[in-house]
C-alpha cells in the first residue's frame, strides 16, 4: 500500500510540472489520467480494508505459543552449534585470544655452520695400568701376592727372581761407526781360533 501511495505522489508531481509545459488538450488528458489513478487507489484501499477485516486475529498466549518459542530457541541453538563446528579451529582449540603462529622466511633463518662445531669428548673413566716397576715393588713388599688363587705358593719363584739392575740394560745411543767396529772386532775374535785350528793340523802333518 505504501509503495502505491508513493507512486501516486510521484505521478501527481510529474503531471503538475508537465502542465506548465503542455497545452489545454494535454492538461485535459492528464486530468483524466489523474482521476483514473485516484479511482484505482480508492478501490485498493477498500479491498485492503475489507481483507484486513476478514482476517481473524492471532491468538496470543497459551501453551501452544510457548512450544513454538521453545522450538525456535532449540533450532537457533542447534544452528549456532553447527556454525561453531564448521568454523576453522585454531591450534589451541579456541578462536578467541590465540596468537597466530608466524612462519619465518628462509632468508631470515641463519644457516648454522656445523663444520666449526666440535663435539665434546665422552667422559670415560680409564683405569690406570700398572707398570712392571709397580708390579715388582708390590711383589717384594706384600706377601699376599706370593700366593696365586690362594692355593699355589710362589715363594720359590720370588726367591729365584733376579734383581732389576741385573736385568735392565742401560739405554745407550747407537753410533753407526762405533757399532760397526765393535761388531767387526767381535767377529774377528771369534774367527781367529778357528783359523788357528785349521792351520795346526796341516803344520803337524808337514812336520811328520
Curated annotation (Swiss-Prot):
Component of the IFT complex A (IFT-A) complex. IFT-A complex is divided into a core subcomplex composed of IFT122:IFT140:WDR19 which is associated with TULP3 and a peripheral subcomplex composed of IFT43:WDR35:TTC21B. Interacts directy with IFT122, WDR35 and TTC21B. It comes from Homo sapiens. Its main location: cytoplasm. InterPro entries: IFT43. One of its GO terms (cellular component) is cilium. This is Intraflagellar transport protein 43 homolog. One of its GO terms (biological process) is cilium assembly. Keywords: Acetylation, Cell projection, Ciliopathy, Cilium biogenesis/degradation, Cytoplasm, Cytoskeleton, Disease variant, Ectodermal dysplasia, Phosphoprotein, Retinitis pigmentosa. PANTHER family: INTRAFLAGELLAR TRANSPORT PROTEIN 43 HOMOLOG. The modification Phosphoserine is found at residue 78. The modification N-acetylmethionine is found at residue 1. As a component of IFT complex A (IFT-A), a complex required for retrograde ciliary transport and entry into cilia of G protein-coupled receptors (GPCRs), it is involved in ciliogenesis. Involved in retrograde ciliary transport along microtubules from the ciliary tip to the base. The keyword Phosphoprotein applies. Residues 28-53 have a biased composition (Polar residues). It holds the Pfam family IFT43. Expressed in the retina, predominantly in the photoreceptor outer segment. Residues 18-65 are annotated as: Disordered. Belongs to the IFT43 family. It is linked to Cranioectodermal dysplasia 3: A disorder primarily characterized by craniofacial, skeletal and ectodermal abnormalities. Clinical features include craniosynostosis, narrow rib cage, short limbs, brachydactyly, hypoplastic and widely spaced teeth, sparse hair, skin laxity and abnormal nails. Nephronophthisis leading to progressive renal failure, hepatic fibrosis, heart defects, and retinitis pigmentosa have also been described. Retinitis pigmentosa 81: A form of retinitis pigmentosa, a retinal dystrophy belonging to the group of pigmentary retinopathies. Retinitis pigmentosa is characterized by retinal pigment deposits visible on fundus examination and primary loss of rod photoreceptor cells followed by secondary loss of cone photoreceptors. Patients typically have night vision blindness and loss of midperipheral visual field. As their condition progresses, they lose their far peripheral visual field and eventually central vision as well. RP81 inheritance is autosomal recessive. It is found in: Cytoplasm, Cytoskeleton; Cell projection, Cilium.
Amino acid at each position: 500500500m505504501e509503495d502505491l501511495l508513493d507512486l501516486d505522489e510521484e505521478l501527481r508531481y510529474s503531471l503538475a510540472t508537465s502542465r506548465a509545459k503542455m497545452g489545454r488538450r494535454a492538461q485535459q488528458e492528464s486530468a483524466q489520467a489523474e482521476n483514473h489513478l485516484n479511482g484505482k487507489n480508492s478501490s485498493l484501499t477498500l479491498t485492503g480494508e475489507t481483507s484486513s477485516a476478514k482476517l481473524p486475529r492471532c491468538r496470543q498466549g497459551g501453551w501452544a505459543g510457548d512450544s513454538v518459542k521453545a522450538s525456535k530457541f532449540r533450532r537457533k541453538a542447534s544452528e549456532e552449534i553447527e556454525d561453531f563446528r564448521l568454523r576453522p579451529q585454531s591450534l589451541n582449540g579456541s578462536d578467541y585470544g590465540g596468537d597466530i603462529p608466524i612462519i619465518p622466511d628462509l632468508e631470515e633463518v641463519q644457516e648454522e655452520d656445523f663444520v666449526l662445531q666440535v663435539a665434546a669428548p665422552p667422559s670415560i673413566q680409564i683405569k690406570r695400568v700398572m707398570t712392571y716397576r709397580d708390579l715388582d715393588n708390590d711383589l717384594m713388599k706384600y706377601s699376599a701376592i706370593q700366593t696365586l688363587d690362594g692355593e699355589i705358593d710362589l715363594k720359590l719363584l720370588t726367591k729365584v727372581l733376579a734383581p732389576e739392575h741385573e736385568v735392565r740394560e742401560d739405554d745407550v745411543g747407537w753410533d753407526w761407526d762405533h757399532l760397526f767396529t765393535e761388531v767387526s772386532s767381535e767377529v774377528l775374535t771369534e774367527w781367529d781360533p778357528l783359523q788357528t785350528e785349521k792351520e795346526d793340523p796341516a803344520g803337524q802333518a808337514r812336520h811328520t
